[in-house]
């Protein structure tokens, strides 16, 4: 894998390299994982068996007599073995957990379980090995059979044993297939560009801001293993291209209110951002007061920013219709937050996502925090 080479050439292990390089490695891994998964097809056991059956029907004996029969039955066995091996070997191209970027790895760890995933791959590997053993064994039995009946009997037995290996893999194949399908969906954030994750209570203006700043209509993709979505806008600003990501329902409430799925989703999400943008809603229509919003901010600082060494940029949104009292309180709370988490917090910037007030200055600050393209 290319990224391992980079780390090795730098003479260091991945977690010891500089943060920017680590980010770069993660981004490249992320892309590699998705590119790889796109090219893999994970069949069900039933599909493999059915495919074998179709191909099997087309085989015809070429010679008469016992020698011809042996040759024919070996051909049939070989066909079954070859198909099973090829299909399963393709499945084994699924990346090992240790070769994955953190986002994808954590998704699997949280929603599937690391052991369950590795076990599935192990079973597939084992099935290939056993299939090979049956092929070796039964090929000899058929080749040395003393009658047409005996040749048939061994072929039946050999094919049966190989196909029963496949049938017993069914559960594991289904799991790998699901993992593949879920992770491939993350292609919209897997191009290797820097990521800014936007947080804030519902109606704070996250969607409005992302729509305003993205070059095209934001893309919506399923958040793997959940019924939630990831919304991604691509932002181009002064030579910098990055993603602005919204994850509705995940960074909108303090974490003690999260259900199990949201907690898992958050754990995976933690490794994604290069910076976090937190939006305060200071309008009279805000659905939560600013104390609540500050608690959410603090949660995000502790659970994402501090753990991953990324900054949180604070923007006070809806400045065009700000409620005076809420605005003043917000300044006070932010002051306190800055005292507590001085090195992590940037801002605040007053903006109106709707009217476009202050957004250029905000972008200027945001891009300073992102790894540069080159
Ligand atoms: N006046 C005003 N309204 C805004 C502003 N930003 C967003 N809104 C409105 O607030 C509502 C919720 O915005 P939305 O972007 O959907 O919030 P989200 O839930 O955080 O994605 C919408 O009606 C927006 O038009 C702003 O800067 N000023
Ligand atoms: Mg929204």
Segments (PLM) and residue ranges:
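N-terminal accessory targeting/assembly segments
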Residues: 1-127
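Canonical P-loop GTPase G-domain recognition
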Residues: 320-374
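Conserved beta-strand/loop subsegment of P-loop NTPase cores
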Residues: 243, 273-280, 304-320, 343-350
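Glycine-rich phosphate-binding P-loop
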Residues: 194-215, 228
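Charged, amphipathic alpha-helical linker segments immediately N-terminal to NTP-binding catalytic cores
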Residues: 125-175
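Switch I (effector-binding) loop of TRAFAC-class P-loop GTPase G-domains
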Residues: 189-191, 213-243, 251-267
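Conserved Switch II/interswitch segment of TRAFAC-class P-loop GTPases
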Residues: 271-294, 319-326
